[in-house]
Amino acid sequence: MATIQALRGTKDIFAPEIAYWQQVEAVVRDCLGRAMYQEIRTPIFEQTSLFERGIGEATDVVSKEMYSFTDRGDRPITLRPEGTAGAVRAYIERKLFAQGGVQRLWYTGPMFRYERPQAGRQRQFHQVGVEVLGSADPRADVEVMAIATEILQKLGLKNLSLQLNSVGNGGDRQRYREALVDYLTPFKADLDADSQERLERNPLRILDSKDQKTQEIAQNAPSILDYLGDDSKKHFDQVQSSLTALGIDYVLNPCLVRGLDYYTHTAFEIQSSDLGAQATVCGGGRYDGLVAELGGPETPAVGWAIGLERLVILLQQLGEASGPQLDFYLVSKGEQAEAAAVILAHKLRFAGFSVELDLSGSAFGKQFKRADRSGAIACLVLGDEEAVNQQVQLKWLQTKAQETLAQADLLGNLESWRQKMQQAKH
């Protein structure tokens, strides 16, 4: 019988790789928690119309990449390709706007797009995202960019570049769209096939083409920054001056338009030169019209998403992930000893120590070898004799020093043992 394997574009994550994921999640929770962002959890699948209306039917994500199907109730359903639309749907449905003020939200989880799998790009991939809803202030744009920068810096990542642009408001984009089409039309035959199609329905996306010839043509295209109205210019100037005041370097990139139709004003990406073609680690911007487009009140908003797979690739390049060290590896042999070991392991774990209990039932020699490989600070040894006498042998695995203790002394002086374990770690 043929074995069943994971689908193309998906992967299982085990140790030691999982340690990098845990490292990222810990830093994210710390940074966002201190900035008072509230975690939300939204469904993995939504009505297809949410993404058609929210992301835009002309985008590649909606027209080519979504996992969509009709369920048994004849409802069109889509596995979420990104997180913002679902977060906004929840914001509207739960009437969070009625609370007044600014809502700072964040989420993490799997997303799904039918793409060609490659390094840093999977069909099931994972993102962390933030959404700030209810503020049109340029400081909100700067806050989310500063937090993204902080997360990446705390992870120790280098060779990063914040790419910054403004796509203005609807009127700005319409004026620019006309100028861009006028410029590109004479070059239509030289554009790649996707860009020729986009020229008619979504010309700004041509600026984001990965085709070399199209990129060369786009380099001389008019800049959207020259088509910003006074309000858009003022907003973008304030964003830039605040980033400068924070000491956050950025590069103006007039070709940066992002792949989703809902963006307005600020658009940005954080890219890594260590990732090759899939260089974008974080992408986001302002989306002042999305809440109203999805049936809510006019609500300004800004956010970003970080791709976790690409972060993990960068962290792996830096070296081994630093996971928590195991305190005790507990070995036992004999009926009474094995029963006592279960109780001792539970009590130590409840007290806050990490304990791995050997469940193999093999000879002590084999258990000791596993203890040496476990990375534990100390090995606890229980035989039937120790179990009867309420004792335990403790062996420090680095120094090989060994002593016999009463279990009551071990459990009764946990703070003293905690200090000893901390000293052994250093």
Swiss-Prot record:
Against CDD domains, the record matches this protein to:
HisRS-like_core, HisRS_anticodon
| Any GO MF annotation of the entry | ATP binding
UniProt-listed PROSITE patterns: AA_TRNA_LIGASE_II
- Assembly and interactions? Homodimer.
Similarity comment: Belongs to the class-II aminoacyl-tRNA synthetase family.
Compartment(s) of residence = Cytoplasm
According to the UniProt record, one GO cellular component term is:
cytoplasm
Classification via Pfam families: HGTP_anticodon, tRNA-synt_His
Q: What EC number(s) are associated with this protein in UniProt?
A: 6.1.1.21
Return the protein name.
Histidine--tRNA ligase
- State any GO BP term from the record: histidyl-tRNA aminoacylation
Q: Which reaction is the catalytic activity of this chain?
A: tRNA(His) + L-histidine + ATP = L-histidyl-tRNA(His) + AMP + diphosphate + H(+)
UniProtKB keywords: Aminoacyl-tRNA synthetase, ATP-binding, Cytoplasm, Ligase, Nucleotide-binding, Protein biosynthesis
